[in-house]
Amino acid sequence: MTTPSAELPALARIRDDVRAMQAYVVADATGYLKMDAMENPFGLPPALQAALGQRLGQLALNRYPGTRQNDLKAALAAYAGEPAGSAVLLGNGSDELISLVALACARAQATVLAPVPGFVMYAMSAQLQGLGFVGVPLTADFELDEAAMLDAIAQHRPAITFLAYPNNPTATLWDEAVVQRIIDAAGAQGGIVVMDEAYQPFASRSWIERMRAQPERNGHVLLMRTLSKFGLAGVRLGYMIGPAALVAEVDKVRPPYNVSVLNTEAALFALEHADVFAAQADELRAARTELLAALRAMPGIERVWDSQANMVLVRVPDAARAYEGMKARKVLVKNVSTMHPLLAGCLRLTVGSSADNAQMLTALQASL
């Protein structure tokens, strides 16, 4: 006779904080327009789909991943413009890289610091690896509160400071001078700074330019990107660039063979056709401009924030009502209104194709 899982004595062996958590669940989006996950709406052209399929079909799937990953690291270094003295670390998505950095720094009393609201994986990875987490609220305009950040760094001496550039869910690209002063402060007390550039394809600048121009001020910075927003969310490939000595230490806690031969080859293929994805990003940036204008002209929208990503944050009178109304009209967006007090009344909208954006706008207007 099978014992009901709720009564299993073995459950007592699971950490209390883990048992209190909720597993991440991807809702069934069949029949819906997905505008909730910042995915690239464009697929590969048919000819490239066929070429990729043929290439993947020739892989030795009976063998563990090998030196082809070195080819991918070299290709990513060239694509990103890797600073001198740097190295590349691959991850099964950037989520894994966040966890690896936290694991490598997980000592008693160690702390992770990040602005909030921000990407939820920073706090979750800190919790799961046994580090403390300090969230420093942004300003009401979702800018960095420089004084509060510097005070928190001085007080908590964080092992890791995460800065999403641009930020999620606010799509904010923070002031360079402020960011550099925060990086300086973190470095002065021996901390690591992770610049999370998941949305770099849609931003007007990258921190890697600073890393090349001022290596001495950014020698403790790890820059993290993903191919998800490049257009390969289904492939799950993240990469981290930073000082070779620092990357080598994080690499020690990486599981062997963490990136499959399929992921590796698909990423190499994408980089060989980077012009296709660059054109898609250009189209999405143009669609973002149109979307921002339409949202600002829409009656009932209380505020629309500028965006440097493939998402737009808006404030509406009743976020829950608007979300449910859009869902009833077969459009999924992200209701972030309960994630943090600063996000009260806010929805996060993905920037899609012009046709997708038009459908989303119609659903939003009808749901306000």
Curated annotation (Swiss-Prot):
Which UniProt keyword terms apply here? Amino-acid biosynthesis, Aminotransferase, Histidine biosynthesis, Pyridoxal phosphate, Transferase
Q: Which CDD domains match?
A: AAT_like
UniProt xrefs under PANTHER family: HISTIDINOL-PHOSPHATE AMINOTRANSFERASE (PTHR42885:SF2), HISTIDINOL-PHOSPHATE AMINOTRANSFERASE-RELATED (PTHR42885)
Pathway info = Amino-acid biosynthesis; L-histidine biosynthesis; L-histidine from 5-phospho-alpha-D-ribose 1-diphosphate: step 7/9
EC no. given is 2.6.1.9
N6-(pyridoxal phosphate)lysine modification sites? 229
Catalytic activities: L-histidinol phosphate + 2-oxoglutarate = 3-(imidazol-4-yl)-2-oxopropyl phosphate + L-glutamate
Subunit record text: Homodimer.
- Species source reads Acidovorax ebreus (strain TPSY) (Diaphorobacter sp. (strain TPSY))
The answer on whether this UniProt entry bears the keyword Phosphoprotein reads no
Family to which the UniProt record says this protein belongs? Belongs to the class-II pyridoxal-phosphate-dependent aminotransferase family. Histidinol-phosphate aminotransferase subfamily.
Q: What is this protein called?
A: Histidinol-phosphate aminotransferase
**Mind listing the GO molecular function terms for this protein?**
histidinol-phosphate transaminase activity; pyridoxal phosphate binding
Q: One of this protein's Pfam families, by short name? A: Aminotran_1_2
Q: Which residues form the signal peptide?
A: none
Q: Which domain of life is it from?
A: Bacteria
Q: Which cofactor does it need?
A: pyridoxal 5'-phosphate
Single Gene Ontology BP annotation: L-histidine biosynthetic process
